[in-house]
Swiss-Prot record:
Stated name of the protein: Large ribosomal subunit protein bL20
Taxonomic lineage of the native organism: Bacteria, Pseudomonadati, Chlamydiota, Chlamydiia, Chlamydiales
InterPro entries, per database record: Ribosomal_bL20, RIBOSOMAL_L20_CS, Ribosomal_protein_bL20_C
Job description of the protein: Binds directly to 23S ribosomal RNA and is necessary for the in vitro assembly process of the 50S ribosomal subunit. It is not involved in the protein synthesizing functions of that subunit.
UniProt KW RNA-binding keyword: yes
Record-level GO BP terms: ribosomal large subunit assembly; translation
Family designation: Belongs to the bacterial ribosomal protein bL20 family.
Keyword Ubl conjugation: no
Any GO molecular function: rRNA binding
Amino acid sequence: MVRATGSVASRRRRKRVLKQAKGFWGDRKGHFRQSRSSVMRAMAFNYMHRKDRKGDFRSLWIARLNVASRINGLSYSRLINGLKCAGIDLNRKMLSEMAIHNPMGFAEVANQAKKALEATI
């Protein structure tokens, strides 16, 4: 009886890894063993940085809000505290977009936060 080699599955697996290694430098793009380890490492970095991206964007929104709130006479932390006191439930992404694209609307929100802070003092 003929020995089964599993060549179709092996070839498919190797082609998948080599396709993912396209653009890598040197042997890493053409030799399966080196490609496999490089692709695994790349996938690990990919996973890690997808998680990091969320924090990076949050930091960007906070930096933008800090600038916009200081233009309106508040610090970032006092703006957030004032919004909570006023019961305004806007997330940092929406506030940041508002500060960029609708500065007058953001100024109104900042004034409401100021009034809420003055009411609590």
